[in-house]
A protein has these predicted regions:
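Beta-strand-enriched cores of mature, soluble protein domains
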Residues: 26-157
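Sec/Tat signal peptide C-region and signal peptidase I cleavage site
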Residues: 21-24
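Bacterial N-terminal signal peptides
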Residues: 9-19
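Bacterial N-terminal signal peptides that target proteins for export
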Residues: 1-9
Length: 157
């Protein structure tokens, strides 16, 4: 009888722990992006540094690192920053492969994909944190006439 009671109490305790764990997990995974959302920021690329890794000059394998300020769409106020790196893929095609994190109010948005020297690029939103923890979608990167970059995020849940 005592063994059955001990077993029943242990089973009840495990069930209670499971209920608390499921409730905690479901509360923390509530998506914050529930509809398509846009975010437009402007990067001022003042820290970009190219590291020549092989033959002298622009060659495959060279690295680009950066950590720049992000401004609002009106380009009047700093609203975040980014940090990341790119590897030169093809100098003749003007292509890099990049990944970076954008730090904005409410969380981070990570992107990965190609950067082209002379045309627009579309990168994949690979995830996020905080308000952007369920983010996915794409980011359009466009060079402006002012040696800056428009980052236009199209976020989907």
């Amino acid at each position: 009888m005592r063994t059955r009671l001990t077993f029943a109490l242990a089973l009840a305790a495990l069930a209670a722990i499971a209920v608390v764990a499921v409730a905690s997990a479901s509360g923390s995974s509530t998506p914050l992006i529930t509809t398509a959302t846009s975010l437009h920021v402007i990067e001022h690329p003042v820290t970009d540094t190219v590291i020549d890794t092989g033959a002298k000059g622009d060659t495959s394998g060279d690295l680009l690192t950066f950590h720049n300020k992000l401004y609002n769409a009106a380009n009047t106020k700093v609203i975040g920053r980014d940090q990341g790196s790119c590897i030169r893929i093809s100098p003749s095609a003007g292509s890099w492969e990049c990944m970076w994190t954008n730090f904005v109010a409410g969380g981070h948005i990570t992107v990965e994909g190609p950067f082209f020297d002379t045309r627009d690029s579309v990168l994949t939103i690979t995830g996020g944190t905080g308000n952007y923890r369920n983010a996915r979608g794409q980011m359009l990167l466009h060079a402006t006439a002012h040696a800056q970059f428009d980052f236009k995020f199209s976020l989907i849940p």
